[in-house]
């Protein structure tokens, strides 16, 4: 299986590092390329023990899966450059935010299978939650192979392309939303009189420990919460205060804003 990665930004690096480290692929069958920074590309390719090239004919020849990881505003130029070299065997996997499958096919001037994936930055530690959507001309074998590739850097949820907007909001942007909540928790904890460094370290470990509890337990998060909430205790007092605020509406507004922006970005013809 030959893989080609167009684009070597942070997300692309997280993805193909996960794939390389977690698969049985031969490093000689993996090719990287970027827009222009050959020095950085060469160093990274050598670090991973894979190939790099700027020759599109070489890259696309016999390539099974071609990852499109360029910045969205660079895609049209990339498509113009590579479309003369596309073969019938190339399946495309886009990690570009906001660019629909139909537009990708239109710019590439081909009807090759195209999948869109929406990972998050947790791919860097092998724990992305990645939404994936396939064009309707994928065969089952190719879909299974792509799912296996994506599972190399986390878990997968397959949805219709229209629902990638919701996945983008919930899991794609999710880490940033949670970081923001944790920031506020640190600020509030610091106001209780502890040193900021103490609070930050405590909450960092609190997050790690709580995540492991969720991971290792078969119980729902609601039940896990109930298990540590004693009637009349300190936890109950804090939860009673939280319940006075409409947290659901706050998060609904947050997610809806992200969904709306994702839809706006997908209207590439209007940009």
UniProtKB/Swiss-Prot annotation:
GO terms for biological process: L-proline biosynthetic process. Belongs to the pyrroline-5-carboxylate reductase family. It comes from Staphylococcus aureus (strain MSSA476). This is Pyrroline-5-carboxylate reductase. The lineage of its organism: Bacteria, Bacillati, Bacillota, Bacilli, Bacillales. GO terms for molecular function: pyrroline-5-carboxylate reductase activity. GO terms for cellular component: cytoplasm. Disulfide bonds: none annotated. The gene is proC. Its main location: cytoplasm.
């Amino acid at each position: 299986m030959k893989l080609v990665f167009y684009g070597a930004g942070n997300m692309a690096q997280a993805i193909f590092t996960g794939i390389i480290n977690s698969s049985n692929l031969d490093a000689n069958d993996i090719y990287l390329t970027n827009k222009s920074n050959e020095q950085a590309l060469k160093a990274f390719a050598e670090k991973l023990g894979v190939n790099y090239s700027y020759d599109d004919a070489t890259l696309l020849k016999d390539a099974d899966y071609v990852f499109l990881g360029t910045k969205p505003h660079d895609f049209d130029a990339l498509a113009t450059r590579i479309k003369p070299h596309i073969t019938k065997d190339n399946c495309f996997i886009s990690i570009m935010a906001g660019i629909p499958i139909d537009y990708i096919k239109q710019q590439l001037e081909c009807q090759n299978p195209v999948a869109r994936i929406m990972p998050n930055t947790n791919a860097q530690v092998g724990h992305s939650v990645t939404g994936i959507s396939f064009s309707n001309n994928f065969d089952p074998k190719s879909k299974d192979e792509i799912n296996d590739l994506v599972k190399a850097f986390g878990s997968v949820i397959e949805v219709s392309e229209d629902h990638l907007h919701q996945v983008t909001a919930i899991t794609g942007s999710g880490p940033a939303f949670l970081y923001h909540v944790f920031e506020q928790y640190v600020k509030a904890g610091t106001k209780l009189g502890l040193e900021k460094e103490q609070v930050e370290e405590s909450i960092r470990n609190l997050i790690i420990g709580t995540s492991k509890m969720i991971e290792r337990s078969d119980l729902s998060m609601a039940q896990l919460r109930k298990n540590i909430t004693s009637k009349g205790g300190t936890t109950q007092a804090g939860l009673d205060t939280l319940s006075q605020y409409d947290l659901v509406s706050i998060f609904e507004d947050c997610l809806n804003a992200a969904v709306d922006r994702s839809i706006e970005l997908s209207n590439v013809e209007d940009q």
